[in-house]
């Protein structure tokens, strides 16, 4: 087992990474204050892991709260089901909410914990690669709004993150690839040597080889923890973690939540960010193409939806958390391994990026 730390002073917390951690309640015990636990999961993950985790936490009074699965349910109506469960079971301020699932479950359970009785303890037990390397770390919680993704939420840090890498053995291939989009992101924004490692190990990762998965998760979480420790509330460097996300969120919103997985939309959005970085003269074509090939090798889409026009993108990107005083800030690459957040770019470069023929770009690789 490996243990990392998210350093936030008195609110610091550990990230445990290893095999079989669901069966080690002693890891979670120091982070549970009361006797009540609510395990929030979904209809897909609960049949696989709820009984196992509940048994490990048998010393506590465990309430299961099972939600419908998918991004389409990341909304007010589903959030209310968590509150309904907590109130019906008369959970008090010393309850601990445990998120058992992927990014949607983690975001909603965390938001519920932030709101319930003005804040109760919260533990992340992520079961997808995307949630293990990204969304479970850093305290971003929330739900979607019909007009924009993740527009209603709170920064609310967990007490601990427990990553049992064996849960990836039941992850569908498409979901695994979606998680690899976030892993690749870390190489692009802050760890160029990691890109080379990923190129050498992408087949091993897709084959679920334990050593490769553990290495990728550890390096990704270490990068995320360092950024969150330096900028918890995304006033500066943390925004670089959103490479590809502004374009990607536009895709998710336009296509309908859940039609494209988050990681798939981020992958296509990353290609657009690479294209814009190249058009600004910050990276060259060979570097753009190298990153696109890696995304392809991960089994990810690298072309935005054909039905989305530049006007569609502009409409959705106008409702983005990175819009400040009416100006859209974008995360781009100053060079491979170094990201920048900027609103200082010619509008014609953005328009050219939105209008680019990505099918032709990919065809020439």
From Swiss-Prot:
Binds 1 divalent metal cation per subunit. Can use either Co(2+) or Zn(2+). Pfam families: DHQ_synthase, DHQS_C. GO terms for biological process: amino acid biosynthetic process; aromatic amino acid family biosynthetic process; chorismate biosynthetic process. CDD domains: DHQS. Coiled coil: none annotated. The keyword NAD applies. One of its GO terms (cellular component) is cytoplasm. It is found in: Cytoplasm. Its EC number is 4.2.3.4. It comes from Pseudomonas putida (strain W619). PANTHER family: 3-DEHYDROQUINATE SYNTHASE, 3-DEHYDROQUINATE SYNTHASE, CHLOROPLASTIC. Keywords: Amino-acid biosynthesis, Aromatic amino acid biosynthesis, Cobalt, Cytoplasm, Lyase, Metal-binding, NAD, Nucleotide-binding, Zinc. Pathway: Metabolic intermediate biosynthesis; chorismate biosynthesis; chorismate from D-erythrose 4-phosphate and phosphoenolpyruvate: step 2/7. NAD(+) binds at residues 69-74, 103-107, 127-128, 140, 149, 167-170. Its main location: cytoplasm. The gene is aroB. This is 3-dehydroquinate synthase. One of its GO terms (molecular function) is nucleotide binding. Disulfide bonds: none annotated. InterPro entries: Dehydroquinate_synthase, DHQ_synth_AroB, DHQ_synth_fam, DHQS/DOIS_N, DHQS_C. Catalyzes the conversion of 3-deoxy-D-arabino-heptulosonate 7-phosphate (DAHP) to dehydroquinate (DHQ). It catalyses: 7-phospho-2-dehydro-3-deoxy-D-arabino-heptonate = 3-dehydroquinate + phosphate. Zn(2+) binds at residues 182, 245, 262. Belongs to the sugar phosphate cyclases superfamily. Dehydroquinate synthase family. Its cofactor is Co(2+); Zn(2+); NAD(+).
